[in-house]
UniProtKB/Swiss-Prot annotation:
Name of a matching Pfam family: Ribosomal_L28
Gene Ontology CC terms, in alphabetical order: cytosolic large ribosomal subunit
Organism: Coxiella burnetii (strain RSA 493 / Nine Mile phase I)
NCBIfam families per UniProt: L28
Superkingdom in the source lineage: Bacteria
Keywords assigned: Ribonucleoprotein, Ribosomal protein
Family note: Belongs to the bacterial ribosomal protein bL28 family.
Protein name listed in UniProt: Large ribosomal subunit protein bL28
Gene Ontology biological-process annotations: translation
Start-end of Polar residues biased regions: 11-20
Lineage: Bacteria, Pseudomonadati, Pseudomonadota, Gammaproteobacteria, Legionellales
Amino acid sequence: MAKVCQVTGKRPQSGNNVSHANKKTNRRFLPNLKKRRFWLPDEKRFITLTVSTHGMRIIDKLGINAVLKKIREREKESK
């Protein structure tokens, strides 16, 4: 499973751990991803999405149908 939010497109970022002595070691900042099922009333079925917590807030704000429409448009453009 790729660590990418299907709504926002958030991906892991790279950076440094910085010690008290200012020594830097590489690390990854991972997005807070959750697998969630959402009910689609139009299609009368569930859909499972891998979304970040920020993506969940977007779904709460805009609605699952509007967000799913944007995801499907983005997938068509990439093909």
